[in-house]
């Protein structure tokens, strides 16, 4: 009879770190963010008062064993609130761009800087990461940056933000160009921006492959002039979302100096389908979708096809509404199976501004529509 003895060490057990009333950890600062391992879960339980904490996740999970940061709702479904106002950071953490976000993913000195992977942030209300609010970090009390975000993904791969409420920040969500394979799902993003500024948005993203699905986007904060969903990614999919108001509902522009994105074939293919886009009277811009670029360097523009189908667009504007603004003659839209309804007379609705090519098939537009108002 043969006896086989394995000399391999047993696989480490994933840990559940529970935070909240009557739990092992009373505060978010008690969690060892610097040493999370694949399969670990941070379970933040709802309590009546918000958690005034901010932190960085700079660790790597795996596809089978992601690192999860999960809110456990209250008795009536209330999400645990993470409030950036007067928030503190666990002293052992050391990371740059502290003023850019309440929850930050990627970019740290301690833990050691890696590209975070397979991170899930779920079921949290994250709010109030913006000027003039302050926080206490490694350099003492400081003010948030104007473009701070509720969730700031500086870099990472296979990052999911799901079921979160992101509001009252400069940007609700910010994803930098060091990110790839991003999923934003079933979130409610509203009430973000900076007063009088067009540069902060409900979400502002630039990634290699990103999907927005099942989200609700509400209006920006009063007096804020940014767009609702602004993106510079290669491999963008926007599907099954409700997107309401903003300077534009969708602002899909160029990747700027990120040549890796501009040279990728995915940069030329953008998919927007199954969404409801709503425009109320009084919004600053009469255009619903902008596609192509805004850098002024037309050679950087997308110069591809926006596949726009199975969407419902509703405009309550008393004046004109324009469905598409294409930034150059190199932009193209394949527009099919959409419904566009305006409450004004059909003659106040136009398909395009001037540039680019638009192919139409099986759409319903209010009778009297025009090709362009120009």
Which stretches of residues belong to each language-model region?
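Glycine- and acidic/polar-rich repeat regions and solenoidal domains
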Residues: 51-55, 77-117, 126-374
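Hydrophobic aliphatic residue packing
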Residues: 19, 42-44, 67, 189, ...
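Bacterial N-terminal signal peptides
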Residues: 1-6
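Acidic Gly/Asp/Thr-rich repetitive segments characteristic of extracellular carbohydrate-active
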Residues: 12-51, 55-57, 102-104, 109
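Beta-solenoid repeat scaffold
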Residues: 33-88, 113-124
